Each structure stands twice: as C-alpha cells, then as structure tokens.
Amino acid sequence: MQEDATIAAIHDQNSAGLDVITDGEQGRFDFNLSFYGYLQGIDLEAAPPRRFGPPAHDQRGKHPITEELTAPKGLGCVDEFKRLQALAPEGPALKTSIPGPFTLSGRLQPNAQYPDRYAITEALLPLVRKEIEDLVAAGCTEICVDEPSMSCYAYREDLKRFVDIFNRTIEPAINRARLDMHMCFGNFKGRSVGKKLIRVMFPDFLELQVDEMHIEMTTTAFRDLEVIEQVSKKMDAAVGIIDVKSYYVESPEEIADRVRACLQFAPADRLVFAPDCGLSQTARWAAKQKLANMVEGVNIVRKEKGL
C-alpha cells in the first residue's frame, strides 16, 4: 500500500512539473509523529488527550520516557529514500525530509533523566545525525531537516542555542549533500501554532550551515518578505508561495506576481519556490492544482526574464 501511495505521490509531483520531488512521506502518518515508533525508551501514548471538538494541536499527546532514548534500527528514512530511488523516473532531483531533534523532543515528556526539552533534544540529536549520515551513505543528495518548533518559538528562545543544535545535527552531511532547513508555524490538522514572527529569527539563523532555508511566507501575507535579501546572501531562499492551509487555489498569475515580488529582494539564482509547508493536510485535488499553478506561475516569470 505504501508503495502504491508513493507511486501516486511521485506521479502528482511529476505531472505538476516540479524540479525536485520526494516520496510524499507516504510511509508516515505525519511529518514527525511516526518517528516515535522507531524509538526505544518510551511508552507510546495510549489515547490522544482530546478526541472531540475542532481538530487542533492539543489533540497530540506526549509519550512518557521510560529509559535511555535509542533507535537501534534507525529512523526509517533510509528505507523510504531507497523506495523513492526505485520508483522515481529519471529527470527530477530527489529529496528526503527528516524532523530535527528539537521538533521531535516536543512530544516527549521530561523525566528525571531528561529533565527538560533541551535535555531530550540532546538525547535525540545523535539519533537524527546518524540517520542523516546514513542517508548520505545511501546516495541521498538533498536532505531537508524540518524544524518548525524552532521557528514557532524563536521569539522566546535562545536562537544561538538553536543554531548550535541544528548545525551539530547536520554536521555529517555538510559539503556532502545539499542541506535544507524547513521552518513554518505549524500545520497539524491544517492549523498554525506559532506566533508567525519571522524577523526575530534573523540575523542569528543566517549562521545555519545549510544550502537552502525554506520559510513560510504566504500565511503572513509576505509582510517580512524583505528578509530573503539577507538570506540570499548566505544561502538559497526557498519562499513559501502557496498556502497549504487554505482551499483557495492560487492562480498562475497570482503566483507570478509573488515571484516578481521576491525578485525585488533576491537574485533569481538564489530563489527557490515551494508551498508554505507540506501538503499532508490538503486534499489531493487541491494539492495537485496548487502545485501545477505554482509551477506555471514560476514559469511565466522565467519566460519574462529569459531564464
């Protein structure tokens, strides 16, 4: 079933004309919640803390830690990448995503051994780092580390500490694969959870040792778009120009206008365009049309600029 779903996800991405594709994370039921099944040293939560009422982040519970955190069989990303390699057609580049340790730590309950979220993060860091190292060894040439918790709580946390955590996590892959960081403000059940403050992340996040920084922009109405000028001087700026939380399907012309706005702050060779976040909470029909329109809109501007 997972293979069939992956084939469908690949087909949809290719049909839209994407330059880089993934497996659609079809082996996961969430971008990060599935990973707790690979951990030893925790008790999986028996039931969500809230079942009824509107869907939201408080329906995700936390798993108690019972002993040292380990992942003796890895975190599953390598097998997912190998399946993508086997199923993908020639042409588009392949990318794999993995949640970072700070984001993963958010669903685990502190205990005497790991008294706070940062202690849990430090325990998870080598597990994620090992998975990244194994992905590179398996031939993965682009890895996106998802750290939405860092962007959600950047306004109140020590950003230099975030940068140190992130850079130590990706260290085995620096200069060995293209490294991306994804930042957003939450998308569980299509709901945001962060304060949506982008400027507070800079200039500290410019010290992240990545090739591409992906930032949710559409849901903030592009109010902080000028930050991509700073970003593009250090790395590629991947701008979220599709709202994955809305069922309004942006037209190619609207996308083209957003691309033109980005070009006021960053050169074309430093810009990447993507949805704000993953499309796991978006119906397939809407996701397909949004992706197709995104590509068409970008191509309108490419043609205008002779790119």
Model regions and ranges:
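Domain-level signal for soluble alpha/beta catalytic cores
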Residues: 1-307
